[in-house]
Amino acid sequence: MKNRSAIKRHNQSEVRRMRNRSAKSEVRTTARKYTEAVHAANAENAAALLRELSSQLDSAARKGILTKNSAARKKSRMQLLYNASFAAK
């Protein structure tokens, strides 16, 4: 088999793709739950989800799934949404 290393690299990339896809899906799901909690004016749940989302984004950035700036931008926007909804009240 001449292309054994190519087959191995392909298999490795598939494993990485599935792992990255799962992590990105987790982040998107938490972000959706967070925005729903903010729009429902549930401050306690939103605060807990914001902490969880921030942790997931940092983890994804550390693993190279998202870039550092992308994770920081998403965290900033979620914090702005939280502050606009609950800080004035």
Swiss-Prot record:
Keywords: Ribonucleoprotein, Ribosomal protein, RNA-binding, rRNA-binding. It holds the Pfam family Ribosomal_S20p. InterPro entries: Ribosomal_bS20, Ribosomal_bS20_sf. GO terms for biological process: translation. Residues 11-30 have a biased composition (Basic and acidic residues). Residues 1-10 have a biased composition (Basic residues). The keyword Ribonucleoprotein applies. Residues 1-30 are annotated as: Disordered. Gene3D superfamilies: Ribosomal protein S20. GO terms for molecular function: small ribosomal subunit rRNA binding; structural constituent of ribosome. GO terms for cellular component: small ribosomal subunit. Binds directly to 16S ribosomal RNA. Belongs to the bacterial ribosomal protein bS20 family. PANTHER family: 30S RIBOSOMAL PROTEIN S20 (PTHR33398), SMALL RIBOSOMAL SUBUNIT PROTEIN BS20C (PTHR33398:SF1). This is Small ribosomal subunit protein bS20.
